[in-house]
Curated annotation (Swiss-Prot):
It catalyses: a fatty acyl-[ACP] + phosphate = an acyl phosphate + holo-[ACP]. The keyword Cytoplasm applies. The gene is plsX. This is Phosphate acyltransferase. GO terms for biological process: fatty acid biosynthetic process; phospholipid biosynthetic process. NCBIfam families: plsX. It comes from Dechloromonas aromatica (strain RCB). It is found in: Cytoplasm.
């Protein structure tokens, strides 16, 4: 069966000038996939050029656009023909296996939750994305959907993250850690300590507390935290990476000797840049819904948005929603009863 991805082509800082070329490039790399390109047809069709007749592409007109600064509540209530809403509706109707948007994060969360609904046993959706580590990458959630969480929410995040990694990376027992201010069990606030007890009592491969530096050491396949902590950690890391890159460029441009050193080290520098290029990790999945909804960075370029499409495709191909649903049904009652 062909996997079909619906794309909100009007969302993001760059809109169709990025989303349409990224879609074309994705199809070149995934010849068996199909795409539904959602947006203003008069804008999208010229950008497709000869690809407008590609049988793997279906154009679906949507007259409205959700602004990047628009109120999520107003977007949900008033813009029922937005490209974001129509793309999500495709998943709900079974006409697409996943959707991708670079649009307003709050609106995507609100509309996805309203249209797709939550999986039984899951109280809240969580934003999950991969982060680079010294030996590969880790998955971290929540990255901003839920500022305040109870222990049972963090347990649910752990289950969802573990099932995502198990499905997409084919790991039987992915390791799960909880982000904390120390490795000892006595460390942390009451919510984190209670959540650790729930995770420890579950049948997840829980390794205990992970400190902030452990994120990038690759100490766990999945790292659980509330959305406030996760978002701060993510944005701090992005800012640090930008500062280091800027400082490195400045140092190599300082004089003729440092410029020569840069030329000698250029292959090493390019490999380093590629390894930690945030565009490679673009595409955060909203876990916990009865369908796959993927959030791309609003500022994504063609490479980054293409990776978000690929992430949605891989999640659909590996039946992530079904894996989470079956594991939640089996684990949640037992996990809670054992504490």
């Amino acid at each position: 069966m062909t996997t079909r991805i619906a794309i909100d082509c009007m969302g993001g800082d760059h809109g169709p000038s990025v989303t349409v070329p990224a879609a074309i490039q994705f199809l070149a790399e995934h010849p068996s996939a199909n795409l539904v390109l959602v947006g203003q047809e008069g804008v999208l069709r010229p950008l497709l050029g000869n690809h407008a007749n590609d049988s793997r592409i279906r154009l679906l007109h949507a007259s409205e656009i959700v602004g990047m600064d628009e109120s999520p509540a107003l977007a949900l209530r008033n813009k029922k023909d937005s490209s974001m809403r129509v793309a999500i509706n495709q998943v709900k109707a079974g006409d697409a296996d996943a959707c991708v948007s670079a649009g307003n994060t709050g609106a995507l969360m609100a509309i996805s939750r309203f249209v797709l609904k939550m999986l039984p046993g899951i109280d809240r959706p969580a934003i999950c994305a991969p982060l680079p580590t010294v030996n590969g990458h880790t998955h971290m959630l929540d990255l901003g959907a839920n500022v305040d969480c109870g222990p049972h929410h963090l347990l649910q995040f752990g289950i969802m993250g573990a099932m995502l990694v198990a499905a997409m990376e084919h790991k039987d027992q992915p390791t799960v850690g909880i982000l904390n201010i120390g490795e000892e069990e006595i460390k942390g606030n009451e919510v984190v300590k209670a959540a650790a007890e729930l995770l420890r009592a579950s049948d997840l491969n829980f390794i205990g507390n992970v400190e902030g530096d452990g994120i990038y050491k690759g100490e766990a396949d999945v790292i659980v935290c509330d959305g406030f902590v996760g978002n701060v950690a993510l944005k701090t890391s992005e800012g640090l990476a930008q500062m280091l890159a800027s400082s490195l460029r400045s140092e190599f441009k300082r004089n003729w000797l440092t410029k020569l050193a840069a030329l000698i080290a250029i292959s090493v520098l390019n490999n380093f840049k590629k390894r930690f290029d945030h565009r490679r990790y673009n595409g955060a999945i909203l876990l916990g819904l009865k369908g796959i909804s993927v959030k791309s960075h609003g500022s994504a370029d063609i490479l980054a948005f293409g990776n978000a499409i690929s992430r949605a495709y891989d999640a659909a191909e590996n039946r992530v929603v079904e894996r989470i649903s079956s594991r939640i049904a089996a684990m949640i009652p037992a996990a809670v009863e054992n504490v």
